[in-house]
Structure formats: C-alpha cells, structure tokens
Amino acid sequence: MEPHGNDSDFLLAPNGSRAPGHDITQERDEAWVVGMAILMSVIVLAIVFGNVLVITAIAKFERLQTVTNYFITSLACADLVMGLAVVPFGASHILMKMWNFGNFWCEFWTSIDVLCVTASIETLCVIAVDRYVAITSPFKYQSLLTKNKARVVILMVWIVSGLTSFLPIQMHWYRATHKQAIDCYAKETCCDFFTNQAYAIASSIVSFYVPLVVMVFVYSRVFQVAKRQLQKIDKSEGRFHAQNLSQVEQDGRSGHGLRSSSKFCLKEHKALKTLGIIMGTFTLCWLPFFIVNIVHVIRANLIPKEVYILLNWLGYVNSAFNPLIYCRSPDFRIAFQELLCLRRSSSKTYGNGYSSNSNGRTDYTGEQSAYQLGQEKENELLCEEAPGMEGFVNCQGTVPSLSIDSQGRNCNTNDSPL
C-alpha cells in the first residue's frame, strides 16, 4: 500500500534539494539508493527465508502438525506472499521513482498487499479463538476443532480476505475523483494508491480494526482463564502435599503425575505467551499505519509522505519477525536446526519423547537422549508414564481422562508445540 498522493518522487529520500548536475547531491542520492537497496534486499531475504523455514518445518515434522500450527502455517504463507509479491515491487517503486509494471499489475499488487494483511490478522484472530477453546474446554477441544475443520477455517479466512481485498480494488470502488488521482489512474508509470474517504475508512475497519478488537478481547479472556488455572494448580499442589505426604514418600508415582501435569500447564502457558508476542508484534507494526491511513484521508496534508511510507514498511518488516518469535519453542528450534544441518539428520529424540528419522517422519521412542535430559526443564514431556489418578490434575485442577498408547504411556492430546 503506497501513500496517497505520492507524486512519484523519491520516498524516504535524504533531505536537501536534488538539483540536476549538482555533484554532491547526486552522490548523496546514489549512496542513498545503494543503501536503501541493500536494506530492502535484506528485508526481503529475511521474510522469504524465515517463512519458508517455518512452512517446511511444519510440513516435514509430524510433531509440529497440530491444529494451532496449521494456523501458523497460514500466517507464514501470508508473510511469504508478502515477501515474494509485495515488498520487492514496493522497493522498486521507491528506488526507481516510478512504477514500471503497468496499470494491471499495479492494482493486482495493491490487492495482494491488502490480502496479506487481512489474512494475517484474521488468522491471528482464529488462533486466539483456538487457544481460548483449548484452555477453557480441554476435553472437548479435539472434537470441536479437528485438523479437517482447521483446514476449512483457513480456507474461509483466505476467501473472506480475498473478497475484501480484491473485489473493491478490481471493481474500482476505491477510486478518488479529484484530478491528481484521475491522472495517476491513467498513467502506466503511476501506482499511487489514491482512495476515496469511504473506502479508506471502511477497508481499515473491516480488514484491521474489527479483527484486532476481536483478537484483543478473546486473548485477554484467554490470559484471565490461564491465570485462574495456575492458581488452581498451586492450590491443588498445596492440598496434595498436605494430605498425601506420607503416601508420596512411599510411592512417588502420584507426585510425578502432579508434577507432570503442572509441567504440561506451564508449557501451555509458555505457548500462550509466544502467541501473545506474535499478536502484540503484529499490532505494534501495523496499528500506526492504519491510524495514519484514516487520518490521511480526513486531513490530507497532516501526515508527511515520508512518515506514511515508513509506517507502511514497518508493517512489511513484521513479516520477518514471526520466524524469530517461533524460536522460543524448543520444538521449532530443533526442527530449524535440523533443516539447516546444524543437527544430525539421523534419528533425533525430541524433548517430548518423539524422534525424527531420516525421511522426516516422527516416531515415538521411550529412550531419553542427552539433549532431552539437558532440556527437561524447558521442553516438558507431553507423553509420560501413566500416573496414579489420585494425584493427577489437569490445567483446570481436575482429573483428566487418560489416553494410553501402545507402550502404556499417558499421552495428553491437548498439545501445543509452540
């Protein structure tokens, strides 16, 4: 999304006149172009490389193929499209001082830009709802949101995003009627996004503000529930140690079950924090732009063009942040290391008790590797020996149903590898 009213001059250009034939100014301009080209190339490479890594990791390792990570894949796809089809052309528009790709691609490129932002925030909104269901209804979660249902939800997100982005632009509902805008629409070398006031406000509300409000509200509820659950765990542990101290001394299995449940809940809450960071980063990167986007159509000369384009690029840079945030997850870190050949590609035991073999599939192994022992505090087991029912509580402070695998181990199904 390029700034409204841009007259195809150097955006983000250094201060000072650009008088023709002035050697000093010309050298400054050339240095600025080279510097910006390098910076923008780094941004594009970071976006593409990071999100390809995320998509490949989830596709290759079955351990990462959870419902939540299906949504993470959708988010990574939106960021990848941004890095491949939006940011490079935006960089060219800035550096070349004109649009070199024709009117059709100008509108198509702008539509893709709006599509990626809309799909991203709607996916984040869905992730917030997913985590809310998972933490408030852990026993119903697997039936309420299966992987097939997740695929349908993702498809609906992209269909809705496509309609709200492509339809108004391709139908020219966005177009302004003043002379400068009409002249730009007619020129093959002008791709400035002149919009009417109604479109700017309506598109910002539908594509950003409404999903943002829903996301913030739902996630605030998630953290409230999570806080209450941690308090229940603390109380359950207190009652357990007070009433069953002698039994624990004789048989440590009950204590192990309670500790394992607490570990699982702490892992879930760490996953919530990671997702919260992702949502918070997205909001911080895009909210300033959408505020300016509305202000600009109300008071055209209030916001300098340089500020507008800087905030637009701050939103673009967000697409490179998410892969870095995913590194908070031990599962993602291990997957990234193996994909980058920083770990052996032979069978690897994950901290959750699963191993990755040479063909990329994951199998369960009961053995603990050296890595697993060293990371026990950080990467808690999700598949453990079945504890005694009398001492095993779930994240809500109640006794959960147990799923026993072929080796007699308890596999909690509500996992979140993030």
From Swiss-Prot:
The modification Phosphoserine is found at S246, S261, S262, S345, S346, S355, S356. A motif (PDZ-binding) lies at residues 415-418. Keywords: Cell membrane, Disulfide bond, Endosome, G-protein coupled receptor, Glycoprotein, Golgi apparatus, Hydroxylation, Lipoprotein, Membrane, Palmitate, Phosphoprotein, Receptor, Transducer, Transmembrane, Transmembrane helix, Ubl conjugation. The keyword Glycoprotein applies. Glycans are attached at N6, N15. GO terms for cellular component: apical plasma membrane; axon; caveola; dendrite; dendritic spine; early endosome; endosome; glutamatergic synapse. It holds the Pfam family 7tm_1. CDD domains: 7tmA_Beta2_AR. Palmitoylated; may reduce accessibility of Ser-345 and Ser-346 by anchoring Cys-341 to the plasma membrane. Agonist stimulation promotes depalmitoylation and further allows Ser-345 and Ser-346 phosphorylation. Phosphorylated by PKA and BARK upon agonist stimulation, which mediates homologous desensitization of the receptor. PKA-mediated phosphorylation seems to facilitate phosphorylation by BARK. The modification 4-hydroxyproline is found at P387, P400. It is a multi-pass membrane protein. Residues 1-34, 96-106, 175-196, 299-305 are extracellular. Residues 59-71, 130-150, 221-274, 330-418 are cytoplasmic. A lipid is attached at C265, C341 (S-palmitoyl cysteine). It comes from the Eukaryota. Disulfide bonds join C106-C191, C184-C190. The keyword Transit peptide does not apply. Coiled coil: none annotated. GO terms for molecular function: adenylate cyclase binding; amyloid-beta binding; B2 bradykinin receptor binding; beta2-adrenergic receptor activity; enzyme binding; epinephrine binding; G-protein alpha-subunit binding; identical protein binding. Residues 1-23 are annotated as: Disordered. Binds NHERF1 and GPRASP1. Interacts with ARRB1 and ARRB2. Interacts with SRC. Interacts with USP20 and USP33. Interacts with VHL; the interaction, which is increased on hydroxylation of ADRB2, ubiquitinates ADRB2 leading to its degradation. Interacts with EGLN3; the interaction hydroxylates ADRB2 facilitating VHL-E3 ligase-mediated ubiquitination. Interacts (via PDZ-binding motif) with SNX27 (via PDZ domain); the interaction is required when endocytosed to prevent degradation in lysosomes and promote recycling to the plasma membrane. Interacts with CNIH4. Interacts with ARRDC3. Belongs to the G-protein coupled receptor 1 family. Adrenergic receptor subfamily. ADRB2 sub-subfamily. This is Beta-2 adrenergic receptor. It comes from Rattus norvegicus (Rat). The gene is Adrb2.
